[in-house]
Amino acid sequence: MELVLKNEDVVSLLNSIKEANLAYQEDKQSHIKDFAKAQSPMCTLVMCCDSRAHSTSFTYNPENNFFIVRNIGNQYILNQGCVEYGVRVLNTPLLIFLGHTACGAVKASMGNYGNLHSSIIREIDHLALSIQKSDISTSCSAEERWRDAVINNVNQQVELAIKDFADLRLS
Protein backbone atom coordinates (compact mmCIF):
# COMPACT_ATOMS: atom_id res chain seq x y z
CA MET A 1 0.00 0.00 0.00
CA GLU A 2 1.38 3.37 -1.00
CA LEU A 3 0.83 6.34 1.29
CA VAL A 4 0.13 9.52 -0.65
CA LEU A 5 -0.10 12.83 1.15
CA LYS A 6 -0.80 16.20 -0.38
CA ASN A 7 1.50 19.09 0.54
CA GLU A 8 -1.31 20.79 2.45
CA ASP A 9 -1.84 17.60 4.48
CA VAL A 10 1.83 17.53 5.46
CA VAL A 11 1.78 21.23 6.34
CA SER A 12 -1.37 20.68 8.41
CA LEU A 13 0.23 17.76 10.29
CA LEU A 14 3.39 19.76 11.00
CA ASN A 15 1.38 22.77 12.18
CA SER A 16 -0.63 20.52 14.48
CA ILE A 17 2.57 19.13 16.01
CA LYS A 18 4.02 22.63 16.38
CA GLU A 19 0.85 23.94 18.06
CA ALA A 20 0.77 20.99 20.47
CA ASN A 21 4.42 21.58 21.35
CA LEU A 22 3.83 25.29 22.01
CA ALA A 23 0.83 24.47 24.22
CA TYR A 24 2.93 21.90 26.08
CA GLN A 25 5.73 24.42 26.63
CA GLU A 26 3.30 27.01 27.98
CA ASP A 27 1.65 24.50 30.28
CA LYS A 28 4.92 23.06 31.60
CA GLN A 29 7.12 26.19 31.45
CA SER A 30 7.98 26.40 35.14
CA HIS A 31 8.42 22.63 35.40
CA ILE A 32 10.79 22.53 32.41
CA LYS A 33 13.00 25.29 33.85
CA ASP A 34 13.84 23.01 36.76
CA PHE A 35 15.80 20.64 34.52
CA ALA A 36 16.59 22.67 31.40
CA LYS A 37 20.36 22.62 32.01
CA ALA A 38 20.81 19.00 33.11
CA GLN A 39 18.87 15.79 33.28
CA SER A 40 18.62 13.61 36.35
CA PRO A 41 16.22 10.75 35.62
CA MET A 42 15.42 8.15 38.25
CA CYS A 43 15.03 5.34 35.73
CA THR A 44 16.27 4.09 32.38
CA LEU A 45 13.17 2.73 30.68
CA VAL A 46 13.43 0.42 27.67
CA MET A 47 10.09 0.12 25.95
CA CYS A 48 8.53 -0.80 22.64
CA CYS A 49 8.09 1.91 20.04
CA ASP A 50 4.49 0.80 19.47
CA SER A 51 2.49 4.03 19.27
CA ARG A 52 0.00 2.63 21.79
CA ALA A 53 2.64 2.12 24.51
CA HIS A 54 3.47 5.34 26.33
CA SER A 55 5.51 6.32 29.35
CA THR A 56 2.51 8.32 30.54
CA SER A 57 0.68 5.03 30.98
CA PHE A 58 2.13 4.69 34.45
CA THR A 59 3.20 8.23 35.35
CA TYR A 60 1.75 11.63 34.53
CA ASN A 61 5.15 13.26 34.58
CA PRO A 62 7.85 11.33 32.68
CA GLU A 63 9.90 14.46 31.94
CA ASN A 64 13.29 14.23 33.61
CA ASN A 65 12.13 11.17 35.55
CA PHE A 66 12.70 8.62 32.79
CA PHE A 67 15.53 8.24 30.31
CA ILE A 68 13.47 6.50 27.65
CA VAL A 69 14.87 4.10 25.05
CA ARG A 70 12.41 2.79 22.46
CA ASN A 71 12.64 0.16 19.75
CA ILE A 72 10.58 -2.69 18.36
CA GLY A 73 10.04 -5.27 21.06
CA ASN A 74 11.78 -3.35 23.90
CA GLN A 75 15.12 -4.97 23.08
CA TYR A 76 18.32 -4.31 24.99
CA ILE A 77 20.83 -5.24 22.30
CA LEU A 78 19.41 -2.85 19.67
CA ASN A 79 20.06 0.21 21.81
CA GLN A 80 22.75 -1.02 24.14
CA GLY A 81 24.66 2.27 23.96
CA CYS A 82 21.61 4.27 24.96
CA VAL A 83 20.90 1.96 27.87
CA GLU A 84 24.55 2.11 28.96
CA TYR A 85 24.36 5.92 28.84
CA GLY A 86 21.29 5.97 31.06
CA VAL A 87 22.70 3.53 33.58
CA ARG A 88 26.39 4.46 33.64
CA VAL A 89 26.49 8.15 32.67
CA LEU A 90 23.20 9.43 34.03
CA ASN A 91 23.49 6.99 36.95
CA THR A 92 19.84 5.99 36.94
CA PRO A 93 19.28 3.66 39.89
CA LEU A 94 16.58 1.70 38.04
CA LEU A 95 16.58 -0.09 34.69
CA ILE A 96 13.14 -1.25 33.57
CA PHE A 97 12.16 -3.22 30.48
CA LEU A 98 8.52 -2.57 29.72
CA GLY A 99 6.72 -5.07 27.53
CA HIS A 100 3.12 -4.71 26.46
CA THR A 101 0.26 -6.95 25.46
CA ALA A 102 -0.29 -7.65 21.77
CA CYS A 103 3.27 -6.66 20.81
CA GLY A 104 3.41 -6.87 17.03
CA ALA A 105 7.18 -7.31 16.98
CA VAL A 106 6.97 -10.35 19.25
CA LYS A 107 4.13 -11.78 17.17
CA ALA A 108 6.16 -11.27 13.97
CA SER A 109 9.16 -13.01 15.56
CA MET A 110 7.00 -16.08 16.19
CA GLY A 111 6.09 -16.50 12.53
CA ASN A 112 7.36 -15.91 9.03
CA TYR A 113 8.60 -12.33 8.78
CA GLY A 114 10.83 -12.78 5.74
CA ASN A 115 8.60 -10.57 3.59
CA LEU A 116 9.40 -7.47 5.66
CA HIS A 117 12.06 -4.87 4.84
CA SER A 118 15.61 -6.03 5.57
CA SER A 119 16.16 -3.48 8.35
CA ILE A 120 13.04 -4.72 10.14
CA ILE A 121 14.11 -8.34 9.65
CA ARG A 122 17.46 -7.60 11.35
CA GLU A 123 15.69 -6.21 14.39
CA ILE A 124 13.12 -9.00 14.58
CA ASP A 125 15.89 -11.61 14.20
CA HIS A 126 17.10 -10.67 17.70
CA LEU A 127 13.60 -11.18 19.06
CA ALA A 128 13.19 -14.48 17.25
CA LEU A 129 16.38 -15.78 18.85
CA SER A 130 15.14 -14.66 22.25
CA ILE A 131 11.74 -16.28 21.72
CA GLN A 132 13.28 -19.53 20.45
CA LYS A 133 15.32 -19.79 23.67
CA SER A 134 12.11 -19.54 25.68
CA ASP A 135 10.15 -22.47 26.97
CA ILE A 136 6.73 -21.62 25.56
CA SER A 137 4.09 -24.32 25.74
CA THR A 138 2.74 -25.51 22.42
CA SER A 139 -0.33 -26.99 24.07
CA CYS A 140 -1.99 -23.62 24.67
CA SER A 141 -3.76 -21.27 22.26
CA ALA A 142 -1.90 -18.98 19.86
CA GLU A 143 -3.04 -16.01 21.95
CA GLU A 144 -1.58 -17.56 25.12
CA ARG A 145 1.69 -18.40 23.34
CA TRP A 146 1.90 -14.78 22.16
CA ARG A 147 1.30 -13.52 25.71
CA ASP A 148 3.93 -15.91 27.07
CA ALA A 149 6.38 -14.83 24.38
CA VAL A 150 5.94 -11.17 25.38
CA ILE A 151 6.70 -12.07 29.01
CA ASN A 152 9.64 -14.29 28.07
CA ASN A 153 11.05 -11.54 25.87
CA VAL A 154 11.10 -9.11 28.78
CA ASN A 155 12.81 -11.76 30.93
CA GLN A 156 15.42 -12.39 28.21
CA GLN A 157 16.17 -8.65 27.91
CA VAL A 158 16.58 -8.40 31.69
CA GLU A 159 18.97 -11.38 31.68
CA LEU A 160 21.12 -9.76 28.98
CA ALA A 161 21.28 -6.51 30.92
CA ILE A 162 22.12 -8.28 34.19
CA LYS A 163 25.16 -9.82 32.51
CA ASP A 164 26.33 -6.46 31.14
CA PHE A 165 25.79 -4.61 34.40
CA ALA A 166 27.16 -7.33 36.69
CA ASP A 167 29.78 -4.87 37.95
CA LEU A 168 27.07 -2.63 39.39
CA ARG A 169 25.70 -3.56 42.78
CA LEU A 170 23.19 -2.06 45.15
CA SER A 171 24.79 -0.30 48.06
Q: Which residues fall in each region the model found?
A:
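Terminal alpha-helical anchor/extension segments at protein ends
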Residues: M1-N7, S55-T59, F67
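Short glycine-rich or small-residue beta-strand-to-loop segments that form or flank ligand, phosphate
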Residues: C43-T44, F67-R70, I96
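N-terminal short beta-loop-beta anion/metal-coordinating cradle
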Residues: E26-N65
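A generic "cationic amphipathic patch" detector
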Residues: F58, G99, A108-M110
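Short glycine-enriched loops at secondary-structure junctions
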Residues: M47-R52, I72-Q75, H100-T101
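Divalent-metal-activated hydrolytic enzyme cores
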Residues: M1-P41, I72-L90, A105-S171
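Ordered, amphipathic secondary-structure segments that act as subunit-interaction surfaces
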Residues: L94-T101, A105
